[in-house]
Amino acid sequence: MSDMIRDFFKMESAGGILLVIAAAIAMVIANSAMGEGYQAFLHTYVFGMSVSHWINDGLMAVFFLLIGLEVKRELLEGALKSRETAIFPAIAAVGGMLAPALIYVAFNFNDPAAIQGWAIPAATDIAFALGIMALLGKRVPVSLKVFLLALAIIDDLGVVVIIALFYSSDLSTIALTIGFIMTGVLFMLNAKHVTKLSIYLVAGLILWIAVLKSGVHATLAGVVIGFAIPLKGNKGEHSPLKHLEHALHPYVAFAILPVFAFANAGISLQGVSLAGLTSMLPLGVALGLFLGKPLGIFSFSWAAVKLGVAKLPEGINFKHIFAVSVLCGIGFTMSIFISSLAFGQANEAYDTYARLGILMGSTTAALLGYSLLRLSLPLKKA
């Protein structure tokens, strides 16, 4: 049995599978006799914050730290290093954020409260999308994996900017000042070629507390810390960035994201009607993900190639691009996260319907995206 468990965690798709399981368990519990206990647990206060708050602001800061590390590595030595390799996924990502947001706004423009959720379908769940792609194993060209990874990373970077600009509450000048000082300290450490990770993490913890108290969303501290970690070590040392990225990845994939999914996907269907499910808010979210993502990514990619602005990566055709663009409609954890920022406890009914829209759109995108990708790829060689 232990060998089976070990083999499971070695699978590329394991993280995505765990996300599905965690979300499914949460939905079952939330709609059972244990539903009240589930909600009571999430709203239990520990050290001044609810369990839900610790997960969304604390654990997710670690997830965003990993995103920061990945983005920096890709910018310095990966798929985003040169203009030639970065421009195609960058253009695709812009389309993939713009079209879903516009579809959502088209459905909800006359509701001032609902319009706050315009960014919900703009996000892509990188772990889930890569997990679905990994189910097809070696049939997937490396260049297609790199395209999806680069696109999703740029998408995540866009989400970080959106959170910073549009989903930050009343700001505390003192806390912000401390945050800016700690940001300066982190990058000064980098400039002085300090490579000891513990120093960055202690400074980063102080930054996280300052950002948490400032009114800017605390997860952004994770991105700043990630960008401050040096890529290159001193002579004879391993890369601090790669070391931390490698160390964090299993915890994020197999613990943090499943815990986040469990804490946020448990939606009680009590009182939810068919009329509510087909109302403008969930429809805007679901169609933004399921239709907006492929429409934006594919059309912007096609236009970029036809106008000579970018080239298709080697070994990839437009059938592959369309299949991947549908997969990018899996918003799931990232979309749920933005929904909690847009509506949260202030408008729980809107948050519930937004999350139902996320589940509908993401599930449809996952099933169709997998099917299209499977059809577009060559059969596995014997």
Swiss-Prot record:
One of its GO terms (cellular component) is plasma membrane. One of its GO terms (biological process) is regulation of pH. Disruption phenotype: The growth of the inactivated mutant is not restricted at various pH and NaCl concentrations, although it is inhibited in the presence of LiCl at pH 8.5. InterPro entries: Na/H_antiporter_dom_sf, NhaA. It is found in: Cell inner membrane. The chain crosses the membrane at residues 14-34, 47-67, 87-107, 117-137, 146-166, 171-191, 205-225, 247-267, 271-291, 296-316, 321-341, 353-373. NCBIfam families: NhaA, PRK09560.1, PRK09561.1. Belongs to the NhaA Na(+)/H(+) (TC 2.A.33) antiporter family. This is Na(+)/H(+) antiporter NhaA. The gene is nhaA.
